Amino acid sequence: MEIKVTEIRENKLLGRKEIYFDVLHEGEPTPSREAVKGKLVAMLDLDPNTTVIQYIRSYFGSNVSKGYAKAYETRERMLYIEPEYILVRDGLVQKQEE
């Protein structure tokens, strides 16, 4: 698996970096969110506790997936802005039982 960052935008209003990337996975299934997040965090020297993978999209017959991640400056900012289901899906918070 190889990750190529295509664009990084600085969003000062929301206190985050918006990262667009391509994942090359020749002869492999679409990589998991955890694998992509781990490699992206290591590549860009980000904090894994404030980085959220928004999506990874695969296209039929292609060995390249496109993704979008957000890296927040603080955990408080991330918890305020991101919907709970995305934080649960990325393993950053536990699902609250009603």
UniProtKB/Swiss-Prot annotation:
GO terms for molecular function: structural constituent of ribosome. GO terms for cellular component: ribonucleoprotein complex; ribosome. InterPro entries: Nucleotide-bd_a/b_plait_sf, Ribosomal_eS24, Ribosomal_eS24_CS, Ribosomal_uL23/eL15/eS24_sf. Keywords: Ribonucleoprotein, Ribosomal protein. Coiled coil: none annotated. The keyword RNA-binding does not apply. One of its GO terms (biological process) is translation. It holds the Pfam family Ribosomal_S24e. It comes from the Archaea. Belongs to the eukaryotic ribosomal protein eS24 family. PANTHER family: 40S RIBOSOMAL PROTEIN S24. Part of the 30S ribosomal subunit. This is Small ribosomal subunit protein eS24. It comes from Thermococcus kodakarensis (strain ATCC BAA-918 / JCM 12380 / KOD1). The gene is rps24e.
